[in-house]
Amino acid sequence: MSETEPTVYAYTDGACRGNPGPGGWGVLLRYGSKTREIYGGERETTNNRMELMAAIRALETLSRPCKVKIVTDSQYVKKGITEWVAQWEKRGWKTAGRSPVKNIDLWQRLIQAEQRHQVSWGWIKGHSGHPENEAADRLANRGIDELLQSDKIPA
């Protein structure tokens, strides 16, 4: 990675109907004038797991090491990766209250995915009219909709 290399922007979002329930994740990737949309869903999950999965898939989708700015509306993801995870690791994946960290599998996967890239993190208020965040939200909901549609039995 060179210092002059343009940054890939990844706008991420997760959604869940029921929490737990069917959930989806969505990512809008932007690199210069190019954009790419990715999304998916899971039958039984939580909103926080889908928020994490969006960030993970954003990083795992990139074919080579990049400078990446991940923009999320999830304080859980942003604070988790930038503030909490180092302490969790030191405590053997326990919270300050000594209970096991939730979603440890996805936190560890996110840490691994992040290592390939030069990542910075940003937060934006969800559902506040930010076009890229709204696009990521639509993608996350498309992930749920397509999952539920695939579950229907043909007439």
From Swiss-Prot:
Record: residues binding Mg(2+) 2: 13, 137
EC numbers, comma separated: 3.1.26.4
UniProt keyword terms in alphabetical order: Cytoplasm, Endonuclease, Hydrolase, Magnesium, Metal-binding, Nuclease
Cofactor binding: number and manner: Binds 1 Mg(2+) ion per subunit. May bind a second metal ion at a regulatory site, or after substrate binding.
Entry's Gene Ontology cellular component terms: cytoplasm
Catalytic activity field: Endonucleolytic cleavage to 5'-phosphomonoester
Positions of the RNase H type-1 domain: 4-145
BP GO annotations: DNA replication, removal of RNA primer
Biological role: Endonuclease that specifically degrades the RNA of RNA-DNA hybrids.
Protein known as: Ribonuclease H
Encoding gene (name): rnhA
